[in-house]
Amino acid sequence: MPAHKKRNISCGLFAALFCLLLSGAAIAASSPTQQVPNGGKNMSRAALAEKKQLERFGNAWSPLEATDPDFAEMRDRLIWGEVAWHGSLDAKMQELITLVVLTASQTLDGFAPHVGAALQVGATPEEIKEAMYQCAPYIGFPKTEKALRLVNEVFREKRIPLPVASQKTVTEDDRFMQGVKVQKSIFGAAIDAMHKSTPQNQRHLLRDMLSAFCFGDVYTRKGLDLRTREILTFCIISSLGGCESQVKSHVQGNVNVGNTKENLIDALTCCLPYIGF
């Protein structure tokens, strides 16, 4: 590409950060936080990584250390020695974000241990299932089902009864109405304008199915609050790449439900090791 041409920012994390920083939304900012333990300022990245891995997984060893020790060191010290200690998001939110990012990108080799880690740091089986269900409108059912099968394997190993309690709140009669209600609570009057401007031959997609399925069937469910669902959605679509328009919309949506600029930057920080820059 000639040097004078404008660069097309299409990579997931950079694109999401670009959309976030250039958003016209009045995003409340907060001071960055670091979750380093007492005395932790004197701890090395290696020590911090080991401490965090023991908390999440019960051990700090990876088979990769036997074949690619330098790579394992780079990975573990970034994820567990830096990222896991950074920011405003608690361990449960970090693990839920990790699960949806791995699901969206279909990098499932290391997925199951993070299901266990999510349970270890306090996520309920219902919260984990709801985080998975939140992926479906954005990545489709087959990819979501692949991750769900792994979740279910972990639950069986831990003797967690299946199915978990239903979190459904809508009926066939009110799923569209309740979906529109949730949409408006996130995006405001823009929803009415979108419904009015949608061409007749696209209304079944951009009005009926979007409102009834994505927001009615999924967003109205119990188990996760609206702020959590929006920040997970932001991470899911950021992981996909090439979704700048949707990312911008959900930056505004996150603001509208009470998430801060720092929350979103911290969420992207959590995504970084799994989707790259």
Regions found by a protein language model. Give the residues of each.
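Bacterial N-terminal signal peptides that target proteins for export
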Residues: 2-14
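Bacterial N-terminal signal peptides
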Residues: 14-24
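Acidic, glycine/proline-rich low-complexity segments that act as flexible tails and inter-domain linkers
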Residues: 28-91, 144-226, 256, 273, ...
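Extended intrinsically disordered, low-complexity coil regions enriched in Ser, Thr, Gly, Ala
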Residues: 90, 106-129, 133, 143-155, ...
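Aromatic- and histidine-enriched alpha-helix N-cap/loop-to-helix transition segments
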Residues: 91-95, 126, 227, 262, ...
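Short, structured motif recognition centered on aromatic/hydrophobic residues
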Residues: 93-102, 131-132, 228-238, 247, ...
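A short structural micro-motif
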Residues: 103, 121, 134-141, 238, ...
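Long compositionally biased, domain-poor regions of proteins
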Residues: 210-216, 220, 233-234, 241-248, ...
